[in-house]
Amino acid sequence: MKASVYDFTLKELSQLLKPSFRAKQLYLWLYAKYKTSFKDMQNNFSKDFIAYLEREFTLRTIEIAHVRKSIDGSKKYLFKSLRDNHTFEAVLLKMKDKKIDEETNAILEGEKYTVCVSCQIGCQVGCTFCFTQKGGFVRNLKASEIIQQALLIKEDNNLPIEKALNIVFMGMGEPLNNLDEVCKAIEIFNTGMQISPKRITISTSGVADKIPILAGKNLGVQLAISLHAVDDKTRSSLMPLNKKYNIECVLNEVRKWPLEQRKRVMFEYLLIKDLNDSLDCAKKLLKLLNGIKSKVNLILFNPHEGSKFERPSLESARMFADFLNSKGLLCTIRESKALDIEAACGQLREKKLSQQI
C-alpha cells in the first residue's frame, strides 16, 4: 500500500526527493495551494516527476462522511478512512466572530477558529464520562490522517490559506498513546500549514511516564492535563488510568514541564453535579496545584444518552471559579459549544454506527 504524501515531514521528503528542493515545492502545492492531484502540479513539475509521485505516493486518505452544524457556528465532522472505512471525529469551534467597522465596512478583526482533532479511532483510557469509550479502541491515526482533518475543515469552510488556526488534541484518543504520530503531525502543522506550536495544545488524561518524553522533544506546544477530580478515589472512578498514574504521580511530572515565560500548564476540570463541583473540592484543588504555574479550565459536563452524570448549574460553576480566582489561581469557565449537535467526544460516530446496525 502506497504511503500518503501527508505522512512525510519536510525533512523526510527532502531526503527522498531528488533534487531536494522539490520537497519545498511539493509542500507549497499541498499546504499553500491545497492541490489534491499530482497532475495539478504541472506548473513546475515535469511529467516524469509527476509520474514518480503517482507511482510512489497517494494523497488524500480520508473523506468527510457527515457534518453537523450548530446554531453557534461550530461544526462537528465525521471523517471516514478510505483504507478501512473506520470513522473518527473532529470539531470546528468558532471562538470569535468577525469585527467590522460599521461606517467603512472594513474588517477590524477576523474570525478566530479552533480545530479539535482526533489522534485515535476510539480510546484505550476508558473515562466513564466520555462517549468515545463506548466504542472501544480500534487503532491509532497516522500523522496524515490528523493533518487532513484540519486541511479538509479549512477547505470545507472556505477559510483562506493564510488563516491561522488553533489546534487542540482534545478529540478522540489519548495523544500520549500515539506520541510518534502526534509529534510528526505537529511538525507538519508547523512547517506545512504554518501553524505555530504556540497555537497547538496537547491534552492528556495523565499518562505520566510519557509526559517527560513529550517534554524532551521540545516542541513548544501547550500542555493540558485532564484532572477532573481532587482525590484519587473520585478520579479513579472517572478515569481508570488513575489507578496506574495517580494524581500525585501526574503532578510530579507536570512540575518538571518546561514553561516559557508567561505560560501556564492548563488543568481541565470537568464539573459534574454533586460529584466534584462543591466549594470544598475547589479548596482541595487550590491546595493540589500550589506551586504549579497553572490555569484551570472548568468544563460543564456535556450530557449524552446513557450517562449517569448530570450537568451542574452555571451558578455552582461560577462559585467554583470565583473562589479559585480570589485566591490567585487563574480559572475560567469554558464556553459550551455545539451542545445541539452531538459534540460530546465520540457521540456522532457512535450514533452513525448504531444507524448502520
Swiss-Prot record:
Protein name: Dual-specificity RNA methyltransferase RlmN
CC cofactor note: Binds 1 [4Fe-4S] cluster. The cluster is coordinated with 3 cysteines and an exchangeable S-adenosyl-L-methionine.
Pfam family, one: Radical_SAM
Active-site feature positions: E89, C345
Note: Reaction proceeds by a ping-pong mechanism involving intermediate methylation of a conserved cysteine residue.
Superkingdom as given in the UniProt entry: Bacteria
Cofactor(s) the protein needs: [4Fe-4S] cluster
EC number from the UniProt entry: 2.1.1.192
Cellular component aspect of the GO annotation: cytoplasm
Cysteine-cysteine disulfides: C116-C345
Family per record: Belongs to the radical SAM superfamily. RlmN family.
Species, as recorded: Helicobacter pylori (strain G27)
Gene Ontology molecular function: any one: metal ion binding
